[in-house]
Amino acid sequence: MKLFKLLLTIILTLGLNYNVSAASYKGETAVAGGPPGTIFIAFAAQASKGGVDIEVNAGKTLTKSMLSAGKGDISFYSGVPNLYVLMKNKKAMYSNIEEAPEYADNLRSILGFKAGVFHVLTKENSGISDWKDIKGKKVFLGPPSGAASMGSKGIIKGVTDYDHDKDYEGIILPWGEGLNAFRDNKVDVMVRPCDVGCALVQQFGLNSNFRLLSIPDSALDAPALKKQSSSPGRGITAFEGSVYKGQLTQGTIKALGFNQFIGTTKMVDEDVVYNVTKSFWENLDDIHKTAVFLKEVTKETAFTSVNLPLHKGAYRYYKEAGFSVPENLIPKD
């Protein structure tokens, strides 16, 4: 709740204290309170110190945000490494968009970060204590046309061999509606990508108990799960179940981890991106105060899982500041 209030305060500050002397740029991110939304809102707050106002539109589906950025409809966005590959190769949700590869070529990166894991959770009274118990149940998988719902299906298929349209009822809803459905017991299981220790998950252990399902070692090489864990920006990771109060699974929990990035487009002015990049890193202490998981954002992790070229403005800052930039991220334009 404290994190939500802090994010809301930042959003209101960005909206109400608009600096008329600075140019304004549109930015899109996922729901406030999740990893991409949290860091993006903090990024926008620091950008204003560099004279760049970013109008943050939160609660968006990132598959669509990256498409909007490629078209030039927005200037900044929360990005997913795997979505960049899919867009560039006109696959999955981008398969029917003829211009998808062209839009992908317009995208540029600013910085990467470790985002979190896919939490597969169910309530104590659900009758579900193991993956096999999901059969015949209602499972919230994520939003329409999103990479998260694809990941959720892959995890469950890999562990159980269950299909979402046959062995259990896969529920596709926007993030907020899915969360409410789980809260109101309208779905039995919720798959929620979030940073480890996030308030969105912890709320279910404050007055009752809940259970996180851990990926068993026997499923790690299953094709459906392997497809997800080997995708750009993803991999199997582990954390202690005790990080959450009221969480019933003891010991280490294995989950599908994911990394993301903050991006822009090649159409945005070099000086603008230089200024927002500089403001972010020069105010890193403020970024670290925003959320626990952001303490892992350092100069050494700046390019975590980034798989598309840096914007030339960001690259200019990184060169000046002495960052070690991977060869494949150096812009050619």
Can you describe what each PLM-predicted range is?
Residues C194-S214, A224-K227, N259, V268-D333:
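An extracytoplasmic/periplasmic, membrane-proximal ligand-sensing/linker region
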Residues K2-T9:
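Sec-dependent signal peptide recognition
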Residues L16-A22:
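Sec/Tat signal peptide C-region and signal peptidase I cleavage site
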Residues A23-E55, G116-D184, E300, T304-G313:
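Bilobed "Venus flytrap"/periplasmic-binding protein-like clamshell domains
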Residues I74-S78, D167-S230, Y315:
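Ligand-binding pocket segment of bilobal, Venus flytrap-like solute-binding proteins
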Residues L213-N275:
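C-terminal lobe and pocket-closing loops
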Residues E98-F113, V243-I253:
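A structural signal for short loop-to-beta-strand junctions that line the ligand-binding cleft
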Residues T38-Q46, N57-P101, G176-F182, V196-G205, ...:
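Pocket-flanking alpha-helical
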